Amino acid sequence: MSDVDDTIVDSIAIVGAILIGIFLIVVSVSNTSLFNNTEYDSMINSVLVIISSVIAYTLGKRRSKS
């Protein structure tokens, strides 16, 4: 039962990270004035690195169990 719970949690983490990334991209595209703000660009880059880390960690954890 623990494997099923881990799979559900991992799936939620990956889907959530992807949705947050998509939301940030949509906000950036719809509001072009944000592209001129270097602080916002730095924040977006940091958040995308965190999202990538979550996905990589989750997929790596699943791979090491197999």
UniProtKB/Swiss-Prot annotation:
The keyword Translocase does not apply. Keywords: Host membrane, Membrane, Transmembrane, Transmembrane helix. The chain crosses the membrane at residues 7-27, 40-60. The keyword Transmembrane helix applies. It is found in: Host membrane. Residues 1-6, 61-66 are cytoplasmic. GO terms for cellular component: host cell membrane; membrane. It is a multi-pass membrane protein. Residues 28-39 are extracellular. This is Putative transmembrane protein ORF66. It comes from Acidianus filamentous virus 2 (isolate Italy/Pozzuoli). The lineage of its organism: Viruses, Adnaviria, Zilligvirae, Taleaviricota, Tokiviricetes.
